[in-house]
Amino acid sequence: MQYLAIVAAVVGIAAAAPVRAQDEQTLPTEPYSVDDSYLSGLKWRNVGPDRGGRSIAVSGSASRPNEYYFGATGGGLWKTIDGGTSWKVMTDGKVDNGVVGGVAVCEANPDILYFTTGETELRGNVQPGHGVFKSLDSGKTWTSAGLKKVRNFSRVRIDPKDCNTLFVAGFGHYGAPREDRGVYKSSDGGANWRKVLYRDERSGAVDISIDPKDPKTIYASLWEAWRRPWGMSSGGPGSGLFKSVDGGEHWSELTRNPGMPAGPIGKIGVTVSPVDSARVYALVEAKDGGMFVTDDGGATWRRTSDSRDIRQRAFYYTRLQADPKVKDRVYVLNVNFLRSDDGGKTFPTKIKVPHGDNHDLWIAPNDNQRMIEANDGGGTISVNGGKSWTKESYPTAQIYRLTISNHYPYFVCGAQQDNSSICVPSKDWKHVNVLGGQYGFAVAGGESGYIANDPQDPNVFYAGSYGGALDRFDYSTGQTRSVNVLPDNPMGYSASDIGERFQWTYPIVFDPQDKNRLYASSQHVWQTLDQGQSWQRISPDLTRHDPATLGPSGGGITLDQTGVETYSTVFALAPSRLEPNVIWAGSDDGLVHVTRDDGRSWQNVTPAGLP
């Protein structure tokens, strides 16, 4: 969108304020820079937290039982050769993108593997990729295998008998119509690619399953969907399930076959049973969606389950995997990790993994007790069919922003996506006296919020979360108190239906001129002078509040309104460090405002021609 540069503009304005106060004559015409020699002695070190972030891609080796891979959505590709006891990142400094969308190891030669970049679980913080990468030495070195314009991928599937033949599911650009999407095939190990399945410029490929008994039989799904800052849409005429019996040269659509649900169709996950090639499972997003099963290779279908447990938040999940040894066993990945042993009719087994929100599963084709699963905490391994799992301890956490506490030595604090807030020591652990004896501590709030440390009491933190949640946490006592601006829960509502529009990660900042004053922002700027006991609104609506950006999110099948879609908000807030009563505010829909009288009046100072 043309106004997305507004945050950078506000930060630039706030940074320039001290210069104006020190030198009233002129402002510099060139941006500031720092001599690299001043930074040459600085070295980075990992201070934690020692807990993983989201993963949506896993794979393993059939012939090497202790070798597995998982891809982080922001931390690259990781490998273990000791069954998950230890992990090593394989891509740092070797590839130019750390957002792993899919990964596969060649069954015929486990030294050969491919991974795709860019994610397709269309969250508000979805990240683009930079093509496909290939390794011939178990991940020690990498070469680009092209398709950089596709941007976002999900699956990569390799012919189990031919490491040079592979397919990738290219979803494409998630925010704009593009022709760079569909199923791509390479017959020469990624040197060249052909687009073999394509519907239109709004529908990308999202899943692929190859029949291990007959690798020329392939199933693939296309998904019409988009994500923009103010919402997302899943479903449309471009979505569909397809089958090829000649290695991807020709395709027939299965979505219209008897037993399939009527449109509109959304996201589809598919898996063919390695036990019986005629048995295929499809998880279909539709009004009458659910689990659909065929025993004739897709000619006819029957719905075996319409449970919401297997199809909630379809855009974020809709993954499944057939068991390689048991025909009637199928796993579904959703909020819970579910298993059916009756051909997809019921899912009574909830497999306990270290973290919730499940996205991918690889099962060893020669041992159905050995598997690796991907969830919002990373990759985790089981060698007993899911009875127990390895820990998810590696530095792949996605942190929204950092806050330095006023302790000495100080703590480094942040909110971790898909987890909680977390503070870790900057120096060592000797001075840490954490309640409960943990390695770090949460300061309340949630996964997406700002954290503000009280400038007068280093033990007091204010931490936010989506939906306008705001907590006050006292480190010395361990007590948490809700100090929300409004006692409201907007989950499930459109932005147009809620009184205050708090962004997924809304600003919470102290006034550097008045240490008793704390600010927060929705479409309005709010302040408290009594530690959140009461709040006062000090601005009008400082956004464009365009109705086109405030409507329902999710599309015509499954609404999804969890707070990340809340738009037209004050996204950046910067009280001046030098001038009392001066506050700058930037909205996510492209406006800059300033007050010089503590909020009594505001001026729109949006630069003309802002890109």
Name each region found by the language model.
Residues A5-A15:
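Bacterial N-terminal signal peptides
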